[in-house]
UniProtKB/Swiss-Prot annotation:
Signal sequence range: none
Self-association state and partner proteins as the record states: Homodimer.
Catalytic activity line of the entry: S-(5-deoxy-D-ribos-5-yl)-L-homocysteine = (S)-4,5-dihydroxypentane-2,3-dione + L-homocysteine
Top-rank taxon: Bacteria
A biological process from GO: quorum sensing
Organism this protein belongs to: Shewanella denitrificans (strain OS217 / ATCC BAA-1090 / DSM 15013)
Free-text remark on how the cofactor is bound: Binds 1 Fe cation per subunit.
HAMAP family: LuxS (MF_00091)
Protein name: S-ribosylhomocysteine lyase
Amino acid sequence: MPLLDSFTVDHTRMQAPAVRVAKQMNTPKGDAITVFDLRFCVPNKAILSERGIHTLEHLFAGFMRNHLNSESVEVIDISPMGCRTGFYMSLIGTPKEQEVANAWLHAMEDVLQVTKQEDIPELNEFQCGTFEMHSLPQAKAIAQDIISAGIGVNQNAELTLDESLLSKG
């Protein structure tokens, strides 16, 4: 099985909260696509709560688009990581990590402004596969933790996993 890019970085050296360029590529027509690792928690030290990450999934994507979309950037998708330590964000364009970090910080401030569960978008059985598995208080606690900690940048050059460790497990 091919080794995915996300498994070639040393998770023991990752900082959080932090932004990392996970992948860059071009479409056949030449459009730049960038995938960002938005790491909320230090891997293997903490995870986002199930209900909190699910509620953030519903809120975060819209708020990030509000702060990041422009003439040169368009968010395609923001999805939670299976390990529940963050989100992957795919977009058209090549914004700098600090621009993404600033948008993320503003999106977390937006989460804190949501006042009631009913304000969570697509929170119904028709648009959500587990619409009862949400917690606005948990999402707000995550947002406050990110704001309080600040958002750094993880550089791939500092996280390259030694080849001798690639197949261990």
